[in-house]
């Protein structure tokens, strides 16, 4: 099934409002035997709604986030409790390939892992990049190398 989400940047209005629609459909016959969590569409919607919120180390919302704090906050809204650590998140996911990615899957960067974002479809993720930046959408390959992917 397709997931369609619209989110406007916080504090924006009128012609200055930034809105984004993401439509992602399931790829055919993924090799992973683990289904995407039932709360994934809600988590994607919540994460996208945080666009424009500032990055702050160790923050988990509601008005600022670090990378794992954004994931934790979004999945908490979907009824899923997760740790506030990109490495801990990596350790609890099933490794999947880029071809298996579904909205709600996690994108990890670094070796050892030190960054995480949430896949939203079409090769894009929503993430809280680093100090001085804001929650935003970017390519899954815009994070620290190497990049790996996981399913909760």
Walk through the language-model features, giving the residues of each:
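Intrinsically disordered, low-complexity
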Residues: 1-54, 143-152
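Residue-level signature of the cytosolic catalytic core of signaling kinases
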Residues: 36-39, 63, 99, 109
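Catalytic cysteine-centered active-site loop
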Residues: 50-103
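...with weaker cross-activation on analogous glycine-rich loops/strands in unrelated enzymes
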Residues: 80-134, 139
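Short glycine-rich loop/turn motifs that provide flexible caps or phosphate-binding loops at active sites
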Residues: 51, 57, 68, 116, ...
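Alpha-helix initiation/capping motif
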Residues: 32-36, 60-64, 139
């Amino acid at each position: 099934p397709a997931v369609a989400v619209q989110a406007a940047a916080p504090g924006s209005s009128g012609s200055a409002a930034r809105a984004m629609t993401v439509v992602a459909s399931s790829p055919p016959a993924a090799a992973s035997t683990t289904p995407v969590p039932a709360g994934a569409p809600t988590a994607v919607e919540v994460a996208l709604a945080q666009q424009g919120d500032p990055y702050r180390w160790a923050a988990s919302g509601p008005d600022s986030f670090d990378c794992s704090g954004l994931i934790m906050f979004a999945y908490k809204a979907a009824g899923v409790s997760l740790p506030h650590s990109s490495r801990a998140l990596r350790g609890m996911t099933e490794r999947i390939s880029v071809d298996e990615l579904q909205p709600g899957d996690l994108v990890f960067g670094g070796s050892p892992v030190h960054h995480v974002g949430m896949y939203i479809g079409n090769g894009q993720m929503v993430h809280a990049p680093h100090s001085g930046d804001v929650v935003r959408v970017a390519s899954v390959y815009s994070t620290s190398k190497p990049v790996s992917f996981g399913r909760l």
